[in-house]
């Protein structure tokens, strides 16, 4: 079994420098076929090089080649440290390859071993500070780890979730963001803007859970311990925001798989925009996302809406783009509830021009003619709320001098520009026709337009996700009253009062 042999090799290498060559016995087992042998070798490497790092027996600084060290003017002590540093690098290379192993246990063990080396190199640096304010953080080693977490041809989400505990360290998180930014630029440039589904999903899995601090005083957990921390660039919240912003902008400037657009847009307002120095730089990504169509276009508009109202973005085509999303499918798609929830938010301002709101009311009404009952029970109160917010649009509810023939309706359904649709000149004959709908609840809801609307808006939150099955269940649970067939209750065949048959016949 490999375990006793590994223990003996470990004890020999740490006990006597004359046994240094036995380190190869440990490194060779990292390439073993048996999973248990590989796991034992990884644990042994962790113990071996952790001890050597703490004892200062690895060469620190710019590492010369092995051949140069043998021929150069180095002491025996320096030659040993240089040689062992090369074996340490061999170990790191083997462990990085094991991050792509078929066994998750091997991947996890390799990841934990490499991150232990990162922690120890942060404690006992093998590189010197490059300039004042910089730190001798093992960035190269961390880059090896990150590149192993974001492979191009396989899903690494499970291993990434195991790595997330290390992202709680401020310095680790900072350098991960820097490394990811570099990786995206290098990888995406090679494939000439084609989507890489596995790679981009892995990158998203790695960066989307990043929990940025809100204040600089909250940044207290560092893997690398330093006394003059206030001089670090890594300890500055502004530096973290810059790295965070650059990372996301680099990731989002490339074409994404369609499913990934939705995932990004869902977390955009909570997890990305609040931590950017210039949130309006997301305008290019949101414009591209709008062009994808469907629910992604809607979520992109939500991002634009946030930029307009919270970050003073000028975007005059916002409502035109929202208006263009209104088509017959909007009452049938599975994201209908989200659409009308956001549309209600977008149209909540009472300062919108009447012609714009009228265009939305009219198009929603026209599309309602072919909508299912469950959608109609939601959209009719939705339209009524728009009337309450914008009383100037109530001319649509009652226009006695309007055209008598529907073909003369001035509203131009095909017009993409709301201001040119002539909606304010029209009337809501569509909703009047719904008063004759086959479903009694729809007919009753549409009849409210014949009355004076109250000032209190209807709460449509409970209607947004109303389904056909819910309507059906509601109907079959109704208890029908007894239907009266006669004014007087019958008491027998000839029991009626003034019954002519009873006067002339008798049953004997």
From Swiss-Prot:
Location of the protein in the cell: Nucleus membrane; Nucleus, Nucleolus
Name of the protein: Nucleolar complex protein 4 homolog
GO biological processes: ribosome biogenesis
Source organism: Gallus gallus
UniProt KW Transmembrane helix keyword: yes
InterPro entries: ARM-type_fold, CCAAT-binding_factor, Noc4
Keywords on record: Membrane, Nucleus, Transmembrane, Transmembrane helix
Xref: Pfam families: CBF
Topology in membrane: Multi-pass membrane protein
Annotated gene: NOC4L
Membrane-spanning residues: 288-308, 341-361, 367-387
Keyword flag 4Fe-4S: no
The family this protein is said to belong to: Belongs to the CBF/MAK21 family.
Any Gene Ontology CC annotation: nuclear membrane
């Amino acid at each position: 079994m490999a375990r006793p042999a590994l223990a003996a090799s470990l004890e020999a290498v740490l006990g006597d420098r004359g046994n240094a060559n036995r380190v190869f016995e440990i490194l060779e087992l990292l390439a073993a076929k048996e999973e248990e042998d590989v796991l034992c070798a990884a644990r042994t490497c962790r113990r071996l090089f952790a001890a050597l790092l703490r004892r200062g027996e690895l060469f620190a600084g710019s590492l010369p080649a092995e051949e140069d060290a043998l021929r150069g003017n180095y002491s025996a002590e320096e030659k040993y440290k240089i040689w062992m540093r090369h074996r340490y690098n061999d170990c790191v290379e083997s462990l990085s390859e094991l991050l792509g192993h078929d066994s998750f246990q091997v991947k996890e063990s390799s990841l934990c071993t490499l991150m232990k080396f990162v922690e120890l190199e942060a404690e006992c640096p093998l590189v010197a500070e490059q300039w004042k304010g910089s730190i001798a953080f093992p960035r190269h080693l961390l880059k090896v780890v990150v590149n192993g977490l974001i492979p191009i041809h396989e899903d690494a989400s499970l291993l990434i979730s195991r790595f997330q505990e290390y992202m709680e360290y401020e310095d680790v998180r900072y350098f991960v963001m820097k490394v990811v930014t570099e990786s995206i630029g290098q990888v995406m440039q090679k494939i000439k803007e084609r989507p890489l589904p596995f790679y981009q999903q892995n990158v998203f899995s790695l960066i989307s859970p990043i929990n940025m601090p809100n204040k600089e005083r909250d940044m207290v957990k560092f893997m690398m311990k330093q006394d003059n921390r206030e001089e670090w660039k890594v300890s500055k919240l502004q530096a973290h925001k810059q790295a965070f912003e650059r990372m996301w902008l680099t990731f989002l400037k490339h074409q994404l798989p369609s499913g990934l657009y939705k995932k990004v847009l869902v977390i955009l307002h909570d997890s990305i925009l609040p931590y950017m120095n210039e949130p309006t730089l997301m305008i290019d990504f949101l414009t591209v996302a709008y062009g994808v169509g469907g629910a992604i276009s809607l979520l992109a508009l939500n991002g634009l809406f946030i930029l307009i109202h919270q970050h003073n973005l000028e975007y005059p085509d916002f409502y035109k783009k929202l208006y263009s999303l209104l088509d017959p499918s909007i009452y049938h798609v599975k994201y209908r509830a989200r659409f009308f929830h956001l549309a209600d938010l977008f149209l909540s301002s009472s300062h919108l021009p009447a012609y714009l709101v009228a265009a939305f009311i009219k198009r929603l009404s026209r599309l309602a003619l072919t909508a299912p009952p469950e959608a109609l029970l939601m959209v009719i109160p939705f339209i009524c709320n728009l009337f309450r917010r914008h009383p100037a649009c109530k001319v649509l509810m009652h226009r006695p001098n309007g055209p008598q023939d529907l073909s003369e309706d001035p509203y131009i359904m095909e017009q993409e520009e709301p201001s040119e649709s002539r909606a304010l000149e029209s009337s809501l004959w569509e909703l009047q026709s719904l008063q004759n709908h086959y479903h009694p609840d729809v007919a009753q809801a549409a009849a409210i337009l014949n009355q004076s609307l109250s000032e209190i808006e209807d709460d449509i939150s409970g209607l947004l996700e109303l389904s056909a099955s819910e309507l059906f269940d509601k109907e079959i649970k109704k208890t029908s009253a007894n239907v009266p067939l006669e004014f007087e209750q019958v008491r027998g065949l000839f029991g009626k009062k003034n019954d002519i048959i009873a006067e002339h016949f008798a049953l004997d």
